[in-house]
């Protein structure tokens, strides 16, 4: 009996992408990563006169061995194993394939590095880094935008994609709240600091009118009057980070990590931090307790005469 109902690899990948978008409600970036990983596998199999539909466990293992030989990091290979497993599990459940060749596929162990965290003064300094009002209206608008975005990244712990996707109607300055569309299209309401309220208000009053394209509800824009993309935000954060903290790699996720760690160090309940971050599982949030514990030990070793 044939493994595949009448669908070729491209059709399978399109159907799987639809499943990820419509049923699992994953972000476009995550779906693109799945497609890239699976297309690499499909290309490898085609050279071996096989296909996604006719792949065997042995061929999948050969593909992963090739990835290792090519020098891919363990984390990248582990991600590809996850994509392959998800694809074949879906294909069998959906009736596209009769068997799952990835069932016994092992995932390489990945060292779980603790996230990079800034000191409170460093994070606050970064949020306040954009220069004061410039003579040029556009440059003044950019500085106001950057300050508002940085306050949301550190002051509210938003993901870079969540900041990029913000619309004006999701900001409630009177209540100091923002309605965030997170992973899996899940909404959560997050408080924003007084600093963020002031920064966003200034940007809305002075900066955004200078940058916004007509009839767009997006909150942030780039200098070309297009919505401020994830790539734009990463570049902006790295630029300020390189100026204020030379030699340190600072990303939007660094600010999110710092937000979570500083809350826990201040005594916040881990379940509350989980809700603020939008984590589906508290286990994801618990990694920040390890960071806090490490910093506690470092403080002890620095300060105690018997350490």
How would you label these PLM feature ranges?
Residues 1-307:
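Conserved catalytic core of the tyrosine transesterase superfamily
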């Amino acid at each position: 009996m044939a493994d595949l109902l009448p669908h070729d690899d491209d059709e399978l990948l399109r159907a799987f992408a639809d499943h990820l978008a419509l049923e699992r409600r994953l972000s476009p970036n995550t779906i693109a990563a799945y497609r890239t990983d699976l297309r690499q596998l499909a290309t490898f199999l085609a050279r071996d006169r096989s296909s996604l539909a006719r792949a065997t466990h042995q061929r999948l293992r050969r593909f992963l061995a090739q990835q290792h030989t090519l020098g891919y990091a363990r984390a990248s290979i582990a991600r590809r194993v996850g994509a392959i497993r998800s694809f074949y599990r879906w294909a069998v459940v959906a009736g596209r394939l009769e068997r799952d060749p990835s069932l016994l596929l092992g995932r390489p162990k990945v060292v779980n590095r603790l996230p990079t965290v800034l000191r409170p003064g460093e994070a606050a300094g970064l949020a306040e880094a954009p220069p004061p009002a410039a003579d040029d209206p556009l440059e003044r608008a950019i500085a106001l935008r950057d300050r508002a975005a940085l306050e949301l990244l550190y002051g509210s712990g938003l993901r870079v994609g969540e900041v990029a996707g913000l619309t004006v109607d999701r900001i409630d300055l009177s209540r100091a709240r923002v309605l965030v569309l997170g992973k899996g299209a899940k909404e959560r309401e997050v408080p924003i600091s007084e600093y963020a309220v002031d920064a966003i208000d200034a940007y809305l009053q002075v900066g955004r009118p200078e940058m916004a394209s007509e009839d767009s509800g997006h909150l942030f824009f780039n200098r070309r009057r297009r919505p401020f993309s994830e790539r734009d935000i990463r570049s902006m954060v790295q630029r300020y980070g390189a100026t204020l903290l030379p030699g340190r790699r600072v990303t939007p996720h660094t600010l999110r990590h710092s937000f979570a760690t500083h809350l826990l160090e201040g005594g916040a309940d881990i379940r509350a931090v989980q809700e603020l971050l939008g984590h589906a599982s508290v286990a994801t949030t618990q990694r920040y307790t390890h960071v806090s514990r490490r910093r506690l030990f470092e403080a002890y070793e620095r300060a105690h005469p018997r350490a």
